[in-house]
């Protein structure tokens, strides 16, 4: 199968990434990727931008180098299951990932992580949970993924985690998480987690996982731009006028 949407990418605005959004779009165009979400880190992450950065994404063109640009954010899970963007930001974004990051949420125990994930799902402020395979943030797979399925929050399959070079120990956990998502009928999304433009849309490890466990493509929201936009509608997001031509 071929993934056509990358829902987790970074620009240099994240503080530890190295490309502009124009460079990311050019790389996506060269690859033939029709759509990606730009999801820089929210402000609690060291080096990340002020929340005004996300409010002002309205100035971004909807297409750059003929690639559809979805305005997003990778928010940090903090406290007992909050996210670190003000409520006023929500209306400016098309897509929000919530993720654990050690500098913001020190690793605790499975129960604490599970409770935080369930709370953030139930807040209805996030569309996906990012890189859940990280062994530093163990959680009850069944409880969290069942809750995500109930609330139509996507579970991210993260290509960077599956490479095994960061968040060491994630690979087997990613496979197990995907199997539980398949069993419980949860939606999954796919993110390169690119911090450099040449990694945009690179999904060899994720595509292998999907093929290996025969994950149903109707639950892979990034299989086509239309499936992704249909998922946004399911989540209650307003239609994006400029993307109507992609709904075929």
UniProtKB/Swiss-Prot annotation:
Its cofactor is Zn(2+). Keywords: Hydrolase, Metal-binding, Zinc. InterPro entries: Phosphatase_YcdX_put (IPR023710), PHP_dom (IPR004013), PHP_phosphatase (IPR050243), Pol/His_phosphatase_N (IPR003141), Pol/histidinol_Pase-like (IPR016195). The keyword Hydrolase applies. Binds 3 Zn(2+) ions per subunit. Its EC number is 3.1.3.-. Zn(2+) 1 binds at residues 8, 10, 74, 193. Disulfide bonds: none annotated. It is an enzyme of class 3 (hydrolase). One of its GO terms (cellular component) is cytosol. GO terms for molecular function: phosphatase activity; zinc ion binding. GO terms for biological process: bacterial-type flagellum-dependent swarming motility. Zn(2+) 2 binds at residues 16, 41, 195. It comes from the Bacteria. Zn(2+) 3 binds at residues 74, 101, 131. PANTHER family: PHOSPHATASE YCDX-RELATED. Belongs to the PHP family. This is Probable phosphatase VFMJ11_A0899. It comes from Aliivibrio fischeri (strain MJ11) (Vibrio fischeri).
């Amino acid at each position: 199968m071929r993934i056509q949407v990358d829902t987790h990418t970074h620009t240099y605005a994240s503080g530890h990434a190295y490309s502009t959004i124009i460079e990311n779009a050019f790389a996506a165009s060269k690859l033939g990727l029709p759509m990606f979400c730009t999801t820089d880190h929210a402000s609690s992450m060291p080096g990340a931008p002020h929340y005004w950065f996300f409010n002002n994404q309205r100035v971004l063109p909807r297409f750059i180098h003929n690639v559809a640009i979805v305005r997003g954010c990778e928010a940090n899970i903090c406290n007992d299951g909050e996210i670190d963007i003000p409520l006023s930001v929500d209306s400016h974004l098309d897509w929000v990932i919530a993720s654990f990051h050690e500098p913001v949420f020190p690793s605790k125990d499975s129960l604490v992580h599970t409770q935080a994930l369930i709370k953030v799902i139930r807040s209805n402020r996030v569309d996906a949970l990012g890189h859940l395979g990280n062994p530093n943030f163990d959680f009850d797979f069944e409880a969290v993924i069942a809750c995500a399925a109930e609330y139509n929050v996507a579970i991210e399959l993260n290509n960077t985690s599956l490479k095994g070079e960061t968040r060491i120990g994630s690979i087997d956990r990613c496979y197990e998480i995907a199997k539980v998502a398949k069993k419980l009928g949860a939606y999954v999304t796919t993110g390169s987690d690119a911090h450099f433009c040449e990694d945009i849309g690179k999904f060899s490890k994720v595509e292998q996982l999907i093929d290996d466990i025969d994950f149903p493509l109707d639950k892979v929201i990034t299989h086509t731009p239309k499936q992704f936009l249909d998922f946004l509608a399911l989540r209650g997001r307003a239609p994006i006028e400029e993307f109507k031509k992609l709904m075929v």
